[in-house]
Amino acid sequence: MAAEPSKTGPSRSAYQRMGRKSQHWGAADIQCTRCGRRVSRASGHHCELQCGHAFCELCLLMTEECTTIVCPDCEVATAVNTRQGCYAMAGYVKEDSVMEKRQPKTIKNCSQDFKKTADQLTTGLERSASTHRTVLNSSSVMLDTNTAEEIDEALTTAHHNFEQLSIAGKALEHMQKQTIEERERVTEVVEKQFDQLLAFFDSRKKKYNNKKGLSCYDTYPPLEKKKVDMSVVTNEAPPPPLQPETNDVHLEAKIFQPQKDVVATASSKTIAVLPQMGSSPDVIIEEIIEDNMETCSTDDLGETPRYPKKPLQKNSSVPFGSKAGSAELVFVSHVIDPCHFYIRKYSQIKDAKVLEKKVNEFCNRSSHLDPSDILELGARIFVNSIKNGMWCRGTITELIPIEGKNTRKPCSPTRLFVHEVALIQIFMVDFGNSEVLIVTGVVDTHVRPEHSAKQHIALNDLCLILRKSEPYIEGLLKDIQPLAQPCSLKDIVPQNSNEGWEEEAKVEFLKMVNNKAVSMKVFREEDGVLIVDLQKPPPNKISSDMPVSLRDALVFMELAKFKSQSLRSHFEKNTTLHYHPPILPKEMTDVSVTVCHINSPGDFYLQLIEGLDFLFLLKTIEEFYKNEAGENLEILCPVQDQVCVAKFEDGIWYRAKVIGLPGHQEVEVKYVDFGNTAKITIKDVRKIKDEFLTAPEKAIKCKLAYIEPYKRTMQWSKEAKEKFEDKAQDKFMTCSIIKILEDNVLLVELFDSLGVPEMTTTSINDQLVKEGLASYEIGYILKDNSQKHIEVWDPSPEEIISNEVHNLNPVSAKSLPNENFQSLYNKELPVHICNVISPEKIYVQWLLTENLLNSLEEKMIAAYENSKWEPVKWENDMHCAVKIQDKNQWRRGQIIRMVTDTLVEVLLYDVGVELVVNVDCLRKLQENLKTMGRLSLECSLVDIRPAGGSDKWTATACDCLSLYLTGAVATIILQVDSEENNTTWPLPVKIFCRDEKGERVDVSKYLIKKGLALRERRINKLDNSHSLSEKSLEVPLEQEDSVVTNCIKTNFDPDKKTADIISEQKVSEFQEEILEPRTARGYKPPAIPNMKVFEATVSCVGDDGTIFVVPKLSEFELIKMTNEIQSNLKCLGLLEPYFWKKGEACAVRGSDTLWYRGKVMEVVGGAVRVQYLDHGFTEKIPQCHLYPILLYPDIPQFCIPCQLHNTTPVGNVWQPDAIEVLQQLLSKREVDIHIMELPKNPWEKLSIHLYFDGMSLSYFMAYYKYCTSEHTEEMLKEKPRSDHDRKYEEEQWEIRFEELLSSETDTPLLPPYLSSSLPSPGELCAVQVKHVVSPNEVYICLDSIETCNHSNQHSDTDDSGVSGESESESLDEALQRVNKKVEALPPLTDFRTEMPCLAEYDDGLWYRAKIVSIKEFNPLSILVQFVDYGSTAKLTLNRLCQIPPHLMRYPARAIKVLLAGFKPPLRDLGETRIPYCPKWSMEALWAMIDCLQGKQLYAVSMAPAPEQIVTLYDEEQHPVHMPLVEMGLADKDE
């Protein structure tokens, strides 16, 4: 028995060793150098070698026999004691190691039942050991006596022990499986609980779906994140990004609580809080904070935490706020202005309190700053905030030393000792405000106003309220990002943009948001600033008097306005849709109009009387907006000049434009098609569809000409307005366009009739004067009513060039005599833009001259207010005083030119305005008023040129620049000319101004960006340089004998050779030269031969009757030049976008793919109407077939425009039928030209007599009543014949009388065809429709005739086989017989109207026909009608022949009839009309053909000849025209 303790020693020792391993879990371990496995230093399962390396048993593979170990790394041998005894329990050690691995997991994480089972297992093992003490003791005795029996008994006991251990291992495996199943069961229960909570959350969420982005989303994240947190059960911390924001502290507590509390914590805390998700955020946050206060122990600040904690702020890695459009609750922490304020997230209250507690603990425990401590710009610091009443985190934003001024220079230090600081400014990163700390003793004058405006305090020692940050507190707070987020209200600006935000706006802003939780809707983020709107939170969250929208409230209170209301620059206006301007009639023309709106005789609107397109547009707009709900087209925030559709007081929608924003949900609109205005509510305004924008405005603003208010009063009297309305309102009138004023205002004279013949017209202008309601303007001369218009001739090219040169000269070298511009070059000079004409003509005033201008105006008024007009002989460049009637002002001016005896064009050189005034408005300028220099400068933008390839600025560019600059204050920089030292005029400048954003804009770059200008390329000017046309495309003739005399007569020498063609130019050089813009020069006028009579070829006849001829002597030169043009223009590339202008010379590629010289006549959309200079005819072609280049400018135009001398067309203009005759008669024909009168202008028409084949053209046209001539007798005389003419006649016109007896010239005199007759009226007969002219005009054939013709076909041959003519032979048989021998029939020689003949149809057969008219003369073509079918065709002579007489006995089958029962519709919307019968549409014609084709028809005659009217019926006795009536293509005619 005494030996028993010794026997149990090994077993007890083994279990004690197992227990020690469990107790030392977490003590220092030894890591294997090779495999990295860690083992306990106390376990003894390792070996530390003498070389310093440590290895585990597995890596060394030691046995008891080993006495030395060689290190696997450094191969150093180490002696080992093989009797350490640690190897005897190898088996137990292995089992123990397995359990050791399991123990931390299973025991720490399993349930309480599992722990109990493990304890029972340990007790059982101990009992098993005690049971076998005797055996073990026996085994030890056996070892001492070396008896075999004891050895056997010991082996039996060991075997039994191993069986017990095997049973215990199986029990452990069973327990582990149960643990896994229990964990899965618990997970399933928790997931079901979360599903229930999610369903509860969704129901609450749907209830308040209008605020689905509130902070509850951030406070309680989605379920998926919480499911991941079940990893706590396995002791694996979830990844930080997936941890929910509100449960951070709970997770920390779960991880480090004892294992017995794990399940209890999950059930008591988490489940208790989650059902309150739908409740107020205040309740949720308070519960979380109460739970966390204990966790955040104050001791944590003074010592290193025992366990590594995860950061409290889990959303720091996520950007602030939700997605665009979401909403959440926030506090406004600081307001600078409505576009600059800071907010704090409502869901971050917990973080804010934690942050406050930690910062207060740190600042209260830490020591004060030392005067030798260093402060650095941008460094983090803690400050005891005055405004916030607590210690706050801050960033140093400004440091000013004591010895320096209160302005930090760029080179001043950014690091200062505390005792050197005079002023420090700190930005509170968690609140958004800045505070200024000023050390006592700093002079007040050094403190800037912005410092005083900010929260500031004066103190003796900065160290008292500042604490410097330390690394460990930074580590604790590094994950709590700054809580203040900068924000700006979306799309609002101050009510007065120039003055900025008023203090009242900030005050009202604070009243609405201060100390309130508001809902913030995020739109987007710009440069770290959230663009938001602050709104009223849901009613169930927080009761508040916050408005529904804060920005709407500020706008409503007129403290702000929407940004769209402030964008008034032309840049923004260009992005707004606009109507096309109204189409204006030409000056000095008469048009039919209706007066649609009248404000006064000087301000009214009219519409041109056109087609029905405008009425159709009004109807379409009315139907669309009447049936449209309007929700998608509502205008919530109208903008000035916005196009729209507005409802009028009659309830109908019309096109309109916003012209005023009076407020109170009202807008003022102008109805652009009528001219009237109205103030309506915003509900009666709709957005306009694009399809309604295409039509131009219909209302044209006008002013009555020649008259002004009675007795020169400033305004029209009420009686004058009423009388004018009574005479003109909504009436059709004739309007005479006198002049087109600025802004497209027409100066007109109205007449009270539409120009009805034989009806006297009355001028409304004169009527108002006669009735004493108006007066004639000063200087107006009563005109003779018989001569209403005065002919105005276009100036000659010489006059135009002279005027252009005159206008380009500076007004006067004395414009600014006292200005030294050399000293102002390259300096920024402030100016006021007073007038903009084009980018190369801008008038500016120095800002300093404003007082001078006002003083000058006062002097002018005092000098000329009561002055009387005196006759003065005005001349160019004279100085004068000008009265501006509209503004009742007097200005200094200088006469530019005398327009007429009573009208003068003057330059108001103090404001840069040019205008035409009556001489009554001029006075002599007093000498004392000339002493002051001119107050405006004429400038020109540099480094730009017009876009589109033109050398002239487009009206669009001028209007854009004028709208953008006129009246603006800008900065100019005078540009120095590198080549010339003297001052050029206009002054070359660059102009800079501010846009609506306050950014500096270069006006030249602005025009380039708009596509209205191109950057000017600077090219070195060489004296010997030439343009491309002068270098490679001009092939001038020799100059000795080819001199133009007085621009009229030219000697042509056919033997003269042209100059040598210059060498070929490279394609690249050619294209580079072409693409450079150049001034378009004109071609020389046509050279008229210096002979009285010359031969010529008619190239074409113009649409106005102008005859273009090319002299025979010039044809060779024309062909030669044409060939050379083709060889020189083979390598032209694609043309860049080019702006064509009227009269510009160009190269034209014709339909024959050849190049010709041309001139632009008109630009029509994407096409250009051009004239071929050397051939005369015009054509409309695409712009891609033109090239802006001069071809041989030294060679005159070859074709000469001519007109018949003393010949007056009927109606004073050549009618279309007369022009058609001229074109057919003369085109490509050789004629004789007799020059009667040379033109005064070389470009005008040459007056001639033209003879073709010896006949005078004037006589020919007068004979056929196309014109009248004053010299008919002279023209009847035989034209002078030369020897050449006589020879020509003898060769060409020699006719023998024998030919007159030939059978070919014998044309029988035939009677007209017999007519077929219809049955008596009321009788029904079967008919066939042979030809349809229009829906109610057809040719029919009686069906009985057709049947008879086919039934009577039989052979009429005699016994000899020769056919004969039988009385019973049908027409078809006779025509078949004639078609077999048609070659033998004589040709037709008589072409009089109604002449019977045979004509060949398209099927190659010949049919009976008659001549209708001659359609063309060269070549001759005849219009014929097939009498048996009614159809017509235009045929040449080879398809006509004489008709055999026996075919004349058959009556014409086709009968022309008019169909009764229907008529053209009053309203037919079909666009395509029948050209020869426009009252019917093509759709109606095709529908009628469908009704007639392939049907058996019957006709009932309604009226006898000559105009036969029938009604057609189908087989069912229904009128055939009823489908047309049902389709709306015809109206029933009762």
Swiss-Prot record:
One of its GO terms (cellular component) is nucleus. CDD domains: Tudor_TDRD4_rpt1 (cd20414), Tudor_TDRD4_rpt2 (cd20415), Tudor_TDRD4_rpt3 (cd20416), Tudor_TDRD4_rpt4 (cd20417), Tudor_TDRD4_rpt5 (cd20418). GO terms for biological process: cell differentiation; spermatogenesis. Keywords: Cytoplasm, Developmental protein, Differentiation, Metal-binding, Nucleus, Repeat, Spermatogenesis, Zinc, Zinc-finger. It is found in: Cytoplasm; Nucleus. Residues 1-22, 296-315, 1352-1373 are annotated as: Disordered. A zinc finger (RING-type) spans 32-75. One of its GO terms (molecular function) is zinc ion binding. It holds the Pfam family TUDOR. Residues 637-695, 873-932, 1139-1196, 1390-1450 form the Tudor domain. Its main location: cytoplasm. InterPro entries: RNF17-like_TUDOR_rpt1, RNF17-like_TUDOR_rpt2, RNF17-like_TUDOR_rpt3, RNF17-like_TUDOR_rpt4, RNF17-like_TUDOR_rpt5, SNase_OB-fold_sf, Tudor, Znf_RING. Seems to be involved in regulation of transcriptional activity of MYC. In vitro, inhibits DNA-binding activity of Mad-MAX heterodimers. Can recruit Mad transcriptional repressors (MXD1, MXD3, MXD4 and MXI1) to the cytoplasm. May be involved in spermiogenesis. Interacts with MXD1, MXD3, MXD4, MXI1 and PIWIL1. Self-associates. This is RING finger protein 17. It comes from Macaca fascicularis (Crab-eating macaque). The gene is RNF17.
